[in-house]
Amino acid sequence: MLKNKLGINNPIELAKEEERITKTKAIELFKTKKLETFEVGTFKGLSQIHKYLFEDVYEFAGKIREENISKNNFRFASAMYLKEALNKIDKMPQSNFDEIIEKYIEMNIAHSFREGNGRSTRIWLDMILKNEINKVVDWSKISKEDYLLAMERSPVKNIEIKFLIKNALTDKIDDRQVYMKGIDASYNYEGYNLYNAEDLENKN
């Protein structure tokens, strides 16, 4: 279980509080327009997102991981070479849809942080799409099963994730409802679905 700032030793309780706290922070990113002050398409920008979301829960928020990690028998970039990999990703082009998704896939393979990579990187991807092609993803249109399978295959076959994302693009780039539904969908991909973004916003 991950060491946390909340002093929680129960993994179920930690997951619950992590979702509540970080989803609330994700809402704040949109409402306060803080997101618009972050770098677009760089690891620095991704780190800024991750730090903002997770700084109340984990000491490692925004910091490059020092451990090797894997998921479903897939080993992400070695911690030893992670900084070098991130430098290469920073230099990847992002001027059109294909380039942007290819960059996103590489950032996912890097998996820069100990926890919270997917949720942070999907926000990062939307920032690039918005900045470069005036679109964002309506994540609520992509099912959890389709997304996870396509991302699992993406290092060797990116056509599936490109197809899913292209079909979910919208020009409602500043739409509150698209963002809120997207946050809920993004968290659901990772198994966090106890809280609804709309309800959390209304409580604050």
Please place each PLM-identified region on the residue numbering:
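FIC/Doc superfamily catalytic core
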Residues: 1-204
